[in-house]
Every structure is written in C-alpha cells, then in structure tokens.
Amino acid sequence: MAVESQGGRPLVLGLLLCVLGPVVSHAGKILLIPVDGSHWLSMLGAIQQLQQRGHEIVVLAPDASLYIRDGAFYTLKTYPVPFQREDVKESFVSLGHNVFENDSFLQRVIKTYKKIKKDSAMLLSGCSHLLHNKELMASLAESSFDVMLTDPFLPCSPIVAQYLSLPTVFFLHALPCSLEFEATQCPNPFSYVPRPLSSHSDHMTFLQRVKNMLIAFSQNFLCDVVYSPYATLASEFLQREVTVQDLLSSASVWLFRSDFVKDYPRPIMPNMVFVGGINCLHQNPLSQEFEAYINASGEHGIVVFSLGSMVSEIPEKKAMAIADALGKIPQTVLWRYTGTRPSNLANNTILVKWLPQNDLLGHPMTRAFITHAGSHGVYESICNGVPMVMMPLFGDQMDNAKRMETKGAGVTLNVLEMTSEDLENALKAVINDKSYKENIMRLSSLHKDRPVEPLDLAVFWVEFVMRHKGAPHLRPAAHDLTWYQYHSLDVIGFLLAVVLTVAFITFKCCAYGYRKCLGKKGRVKKAHKSKTH
C-alpha cells in the first residue's frame, strides 16, 4: 500500500501541473496590428495571457498612436505616418464634443459624413504609408510570424496578412454596416436581426422592419465611402483585384467581444467565437483613496459615473443639470470628469480624473452605474451585477443601451433632451426598484455560467490557428458561390423554366387535341346533314 501511495504522488503532481500550468506545445510568434483607443485596450488581457504562455508578440502601430505605447509583455514596432498625435487626439475629442451639439437631423448627417470622410482619409494615408514602407514590410516578411491577431475595423491589417500569407484571427466587437456577417457568409435576415444604429429590438413592428431594411441599404452607401478606397489600395499593393469582402473573409477565426446575454439571438457561423466579458474577469484591490470614499458613503453606498475617455468636457448648462440631479440622491457619486467643475456640484459628488471602473463596480457597496453604454462598461456592469442609467452618445452605444433596457437591466436617457429631473428619477428607479437589480443579477448569472472563461477561449483559438496554420475546415462553401448561386436563383430559374416548358407543351398538346376533336365533330355533323338531305 505504501509503495502504491508513493508511486501515485508523481502522477497526481503531474496531473496538477497539466491542469494548472500553462502548457504550450509550440511557442509561436504573433504579429498584432491593433486599432487605437478602446479597441486596443480591449486586447491587452489576451496579449498578456499569450505572452505568459510563452509566445512572442510584436505590436505594429503608427508613431502617432494615442494609447499604443511600449509594454512589458510585447515588442512595439512603429512606422511613420503623415499626421501627428495631436491630429488623432483632435479626432477623438471632436467626436465627444459633437455629441452635445443640438443640431437638426440634416445638419447631423452632413457633419457626420464630413467627419467620417476626413478621418477616413487620415487613416487611409497611414495605411498607405505602412504598405509602401518597403524596409518595414521586408522586415516583417523575414520575421516568420505564425499568425496575425488584429482588429479589422480598419481593413489595412488584412492587406498585410495577405501580403505575408499569414493565417489571421480577428478580435472585435462589431463592424460597421454588418460587414462581419457579409464576410463570414452568415445569414442576416432583416426580419428579426436589427441593423447597427437602428436602436431596434429583435421584435420589430412592420414599420420598424421597413426602417431596418432602409437602414441596411443606406449604410451600404456610407461604408462604400469609408472602405472602397482600401479595396483600391489593396488591389494596387497585392497586384490583383481585391474587394473589402475578400480581405475580411480571409480570416480563419473571428473572436467577437459579445455574447447572447447582451445581444439578441441570431444565426452564427462555425468560425465565429464569442468572448464577451473578456475584460472584466480580474479585479484589483482598491487604493486607499477610493476605499476611503466608499467607507465614507455609509449604508447608502456609491454610484459610479463615467462617459468614457472621449468626453472630456460637457457644456456648462448640461453639466450643471447633471450635477443638480446627482446632489438629490443620498449615495456618494464618483464622477470621472476632466472638464470644468460645475458651480453647483453637491458635497456627495466627487470629481476624479480617472477611476478603476471594473474594481469599483465589483464592490458590494456600488448601487448604480451611470454610463455611455460602451461595450466595455456594459459588460463590466453585467459581470458585476450593477444596474445602469445609460446615456448613449454615438456609434453602437445606442444599440447597447436598447439591448440592456429591453432586458430590464437599466434605464436609457437622451443626453441632449434629458432634464435634471429625468436623471434624478432614473437613478432613483434603478437604485430603489429591485427589478433592475434582479434582472442584471440574472444576466450576470447567465453570463458567468459557461464551461470556459472568455480569456481562455480567446487564447485557445489563437493557438489553434497557430498550430493548424488556419482553420479551413470551418470555412463554409458559401464563400465559393456567386451571389445568384448562394440564393439558388439559377436553380429557381431552371425549375421555373422546366415548369413553364411543361406547361407550354401541355397547353399546346391540349390545344392540338381540342382542335382535332372539334374538327372531327364538325366532319361528323357535316356527313350527317348530307345523309338526311
């Protein structure tokens, strides 16, 4: 018995090491081309985990990046671009400022179109400088990367991937105009899948379905303005005719920072993997400063307030209306705000330039979260079970807010039209009405009830693509069909032609028989008449 016990110890130890330790069969080399801003920040957890598992990571970014800097767990390579960091910052800041301008619908459309065109031209010039940097491209080709991990929001990185013949893993939340579903050949029916920026739920009225279809058609025009220049650039650089859909459909695996707890159920494809909540797994201890704020709040607890990094300043009148509402609740409010301090700011409201959002939301004394409904904040709220007051500002935030409101996890306010009383009532509702807390806790329970953590799942698929040089077995044959073959229009046309041909022949035969029969009767009658006479 003793011998068996001693012999079993190494076996148990080995099993524990296999389960607990990072086992990597092959330490690979990963080329990462991110998109600046929150897109980049969302990738950091996965990058760090991949580095801890022994992989070498090279991050390629323009030298004018705002957020992409040197890091301890990756090597940063930069390339020169024809714009400065200040230009990028101005683009981010202006986006936040434009939100609070109370323009007419037509003015907003014109301003949005001009801004998109201006920003797109700047980003396209950066892509062109990267592709035509012969020394850098040669260096990348010689580096023998195993895989590219990238956010395809800008389709420059897929061009690089095709040039280097690298299998690619896309890491994203969503693409404009539902391009991700076109690129994966995923069914995307208008009838129950709301289009981006529609603010519809998956249960639409007839008129909403009409609007949903019209939005899809109009977005195609907008996306053509943004993305068609990349197709031209790619065709010139790769020396073959390439469309944006060709570039995007080359991905081996798509890692989506979403799941069906937040989003509505819809069709998916085999190479679409969902890793929603990847950024809210780990919490750090709060600093003494924030612990002191929470302890001083007493039994009422705290409210966390952040509208994201793009909103640095709110118009004075609106800021005062917000401050007035915050002063009318008993909770302590931690407001991340770098603008001018409102003159009527109450004693219960503390302005901070930065706050550990996920760590604060995870504290049991947090009662509510005032947010712009960005995907990061929404998932942190779901993970930690904190009901929301949502003030969506732009982009997919409107859709995120609609989804959470539909699920009973928060209240949505129009930031331009809301009054101080509206905000006060919304806060009191989500704090005092138990249904909001119960609903967000139910979503949190559903979100956490899974066999694999999102971060581990993302890392697995990156390594999977590295090991197998892609994932062609997950690629549907729909990619190889023409549009009329995909919709079986040729088959329908053929069957229709057969039916019409058979119908025509049948008609002709019947007509011929009828004429023959009629002619025979006529001759019989004629013969009968001649006999009687």
From Swiss-Prot:
What Gene Ontology cellular-component terms does the record carry? endoplasmic reticulum; endoplasmic reticulum chaperone complex; endoplasmic reticulum membrane; perinuclear region of cytoplasm; plasma membrane
What outcome is documented for mutating F83L in this protein?
A: In GILBS; displays less than 10% of wild-type bilirubin glucuronidation activity
Q: How does it assemble?
A: Homodimer. Homooligomer. Interacts with UGT1A3, UGT1A4, UGT1A6, UGT1A7, UGT1A8, UGT1A9 and UGT1A10 to form heterodimers. Isoform 1 interacts with isoform 2/i2 suggesting that oligomerization is involved in negative regulation of transferase activity by isoform 2. Isoform 1 also interacts with respective i2 isoforms of UGT1A3, UGT1A4, UGT1A6, UGT1A7, UGT1A8, UGT1A9 and UGT1A10.
InterPro entries in the record, alphabetically?
A: UDP-glycosyltransferase, UDP_glucos_trans, UDP_glycos_trans_CS
* Recorded name of the encoding gene: UGT1A1
Q: What is the effect of changing L15R?
A: In CN2; mutant protein rapidly degraded by the proteasome owing to its mislocalization in the cell
**Additional detail:** UGT1A1 isoform is part of the UGT1A complex locus which displays alternative use of promoters, first exons and terminal exons. The locus is defined by 13 first exons, which are alternatively spliced to 3 other common exons and 2 alternative terminal exons 5. From the 27 possible mRNA isoforms, 9 produce functionally active polypeptides (UGT1A1, 1A3, 1A4, 1A5, 1A6, 1A7, 1A8, 1A9 and 1A10) called isoforms 1 (i1). Use of an alternative exon 5 (5b) as terminal exon is leading to 9 additional alternatively spliced products termed isoforms i2 and which lack transferase activity.
- Give the similarity note: Belongs to the UDP-glycosyltransferase family.
A Pfam short name = UDPGT
Give the originating organism: Homo sapiens
| Outcome of swapping S191F | In CN2; has low residual bilirubin glucuronidation activity of about 5.3% of that of the wild-type protein
Q: What is the effect of changing Y486D?
A: In CN2, GILBS and HBLRTFN; displays less than 10% of wild-type bilirubin glucuronidation activity; decreased SN-38 glucuronosyltransferase activity
Q: What is the effect of changing R336L?
A: In CN1 and CN2
The domain of life for this entry's organism is: Eukaryota
Report the protein name in the record: UDP-glucuronosyltransferase 1A1
Q: What is the effect of changing R209W?
A: In CN2; has low residual bilirubin glucuronidation activity of about 2.9% of that of the wild-type protein
Q: Which GO terms describe its biological process?
A: bilirubin conjugation; estrogen metabolic process; flavone metabolic process; flavonoid metabolic process; negative regulation of fatty acid metabolic process; negative regulation of steroid metabolic process; retinoic acid metabolic process; steroid metabolic process
Which residues are modified by glycosylation? N102, N295, N347
Its signal peptide is 1-25
- The residues that cross the membrane are 491-507
